[in-house]
C-alpha cells in the first residue's frame, strides 16, 4: 500500500505524468501528487541500489523553522485520503492515508504549541476547518489508537487560541 512517499528519488515513464501537475504556491507538493501518480502505474519496480543522493541545503523546507506553509502537507494528505475514498481503494490504504493526515496535523499542532507565534496559531485555526470535515471517519479508522483519536478530536474542535496560549 502507498500512503507516504516523495517524488524526488524515483524514475518515471513520461506518460504517467500526463495531466498531472504540482500545485503552484504550495509547500510539500509531493503530498498532493504522489498518490495520483502511483495510482496510474500498472507496475512499480523497487531496486536495492542507491541511485540518488539527497543533498541537505540551508533554506530548504526541511531545514528551516516552522512556518504556516507547513500545514500545506496536511492539505495534501487530506487530498490523498479523499482520493483513495473516491477511487475505491482498499480499506487499509484509506485508513493509512487518513491516519497519516491526522498524524501530520497533530505533529504540527504540537510544534506550534511549543512556540505559539500568532501566524502559526492562525494557521491551525484555518486548518481546523479542513480537519473538522474529516472527523466523521475518525471512529472507523483502524490505523489510529484511541489516544490519537481523542487528541485528533480535541485539536480539531477546540479553539486554537485555547490549545496554544500565547507565552
Give short role names for the model-derived ranges.
Residues 48:
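A cytosolic small-molecule/anion-sensing beta-strand core signal
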Residues 89-99, 147-150:
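Structural motif
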Residues 1-45, 59-65:
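Donor-binding/catalytic cores of nucleotide-activated saccharide
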Residues 51-58, 64-91, 105-134:
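Catalytic core of nucleotide-sugar-dependent glycosyltransferases
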Amino acid at each position: 500500500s502507498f500512503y507516504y512517499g516523495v517524488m524526488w528519488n524515483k524514475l518515471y515513464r513520461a506518460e504517467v505524468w500526463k495531466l498531472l501537475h504540482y500545485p503552484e504556491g504550495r509547500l510539500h507538493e509531493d503530498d498532493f501528487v504522489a498518490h495520483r501518480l502511483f495510482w496510474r502505474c500498472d507496475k512499480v519496480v523497487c531496486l536495492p541500489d542507491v541511485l540518488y543522493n539527497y543533498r541537505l541545503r540551508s533554506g530548504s523546507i526541511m531545514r528551516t523553522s516552522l512556518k504556516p506553509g507547513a500545514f500545506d502537507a496536511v492539505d495534501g494528505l487530506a487530498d490523498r485520503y479523499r482520493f483513495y475514498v473516491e477511487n475505491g481503494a482498499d480499506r487499509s490504504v484509506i485508513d493509512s492515508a487518513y491516519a497519516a493526515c491526522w498524524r501530520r496535523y497533530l505533529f504540527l499542532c504540537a510544534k506550534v504549541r511549543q512556540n505559539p507565534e500568532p501566524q502559526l496559531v492562525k494557521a491551525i485555526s484555518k486548518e481546523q476547518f479542513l480537519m473538522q470535515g474529516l472527523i466523521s471517519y475518525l471512529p472507523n479508522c483502524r490505523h489510529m489508537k484511541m489516544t490519537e483519536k481523542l487528541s485528533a478530536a480535541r485539536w480539531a474542535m477546540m479553539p486554537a487560541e485555547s490549545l496554544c496560549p500565547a507565552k
